[in-house]
Amino acid sequence: MEDTVKITAEELKGYIERIEKLEQEKRDVQDHIRDVYAKAADEGWDIKVMKQIIRLRKMDDDDREEQEILLDTYKRALGMSYEEELSE
C-alpha cells in the first residue's frame, strides 16, 4: 500500500510540475504578445483594432459573416451606418 501511495504521489507531483512549467511558458508568451502590441503601437497602429481583427480571424467564416450582418443591422437601426452618412 505504501508503494502505491508513493507512486501516486510521484505521479501527482509530475502533473503539478508540468502544469507549473506550462503556466510559466504561458506567461512568457503573454509577455511576448504584449511586446509585439507595444511595438505596433509605437509605429502608430491602433491596438484596439488589431485585437478586434485577431478576434475576427479566430472565428469561423459563417459565424464572422453572421456577426458582421447583425452588427450592420444594429448600426443601421441606430442611424450609425457608414452608408447613411454617405447619403446625407
UniProtKB/Swiss-Prot annotation:
Name of a matching Pfam family: GapR_DNA-bd
**InterPro entries membership:** GapR-like, GapR-like_DNA-bd
Lineage top rank: taxon: Bacteria
Give GO MF terms, alphabetically: DNA binding
Give the family from UniProt.
Belongs to the UPF0335 family.
Q: What is this protein called?
A: UPF0335 protein WD_0557
Q: Which organism is it from?
A: Wolbachia pipientis wMel
Q: What is the lineage of its organism?
A: Bacteria, Pseudomonadati, Pseudomonadota, Alphaproteobacteria, Rickettsiales
